[in-house]
Amino acid sequence: MAENKYQYSYQYPHPAVTTDCVVFGYDVAPGDRESKKKNKRMALQVLLIERGGEPYKGSWALPGGFLRSEDYDGRPADENVEACALRELREETGVDVDSVEQFKVYSELNRDPRERVITVAHLALVKKCEVVGGDDAANAQWFDINDLPELAFDHQQILDDALEELRCRIHYKPIGFELMPEQFTMSQLKQLYDTILDNDAEHELDRRNFHRKMVTLGIVEPADASAERRERSRIMF
């Protein structure tokens, strides 16, 4: 009798569950890498993989994949969506991060041509690193967010939402540390914020107000007093 008590729970369809990762980095814009200019343009970049199989073979997409229900020996897999996101990111790009943050669930009926698939989207910020395609990804590459290829599935929508989420977080959460080197100037940090907010020259953040806010919040501190004396407009933090 007890075995049949919850039998009804298996009468409902079981959609597949996947994770997708939006991984942002910050580096010299591709067009300026070979330039001899002293002040090269920096760009917010996103990590994409080239799909090695159908559907959308050869198209670019966000790194991600299916939540495991079984391990390699056929036993039930103890994997939550965060572990799945970390595993897929590592397998498909070689990027190994400590954590990712969920920001939205996508469940539109026809978002995947194979079957009903619900994906849990995650966001990560990393210092720019070398990447390599692996597992079912034919390639992995960083792209300037303003110069993207056409993306598979609904991944453009996911990326747009992630960028909006990042722009919201920047107003209440310090994010520069994940994207900047260990030491940086206040000017470089301001440039990062202007880049994320897509501010042009007419709408960029006020330098003095930005400096005051960062110091008041206590999230940065001078790395070298001599550097401060040497050039106050470029204090190292």
Task: List PLM regions with ranges.
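Core subunits and conserved enzymes of cellular information-processing
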Residues: 1, 32-34, 40-41, 49, ...
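N-terminal strand-loop-strand
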Residues: 6-62, 82
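The catalytic Nudix box helix
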Residues: 62, 67-101, 122, 189
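Acidic pyrophosphate-coordinating catalytic loop
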Residues: 106-118, 130
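NUDIX/MutT-family hydrolases
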Residues: 123-124, 131-170, 179-192, 210-218
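Short, positively charged loop/turn segments that connect secondary-structure elements
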Residues: 195-210, 225-229
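A short, conserved structural fragment
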Residues: 216-228
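C-terminal engagement modules used by replication, chromatin/transcription, nuclear envelope/ESCRT
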Residues: 228-237
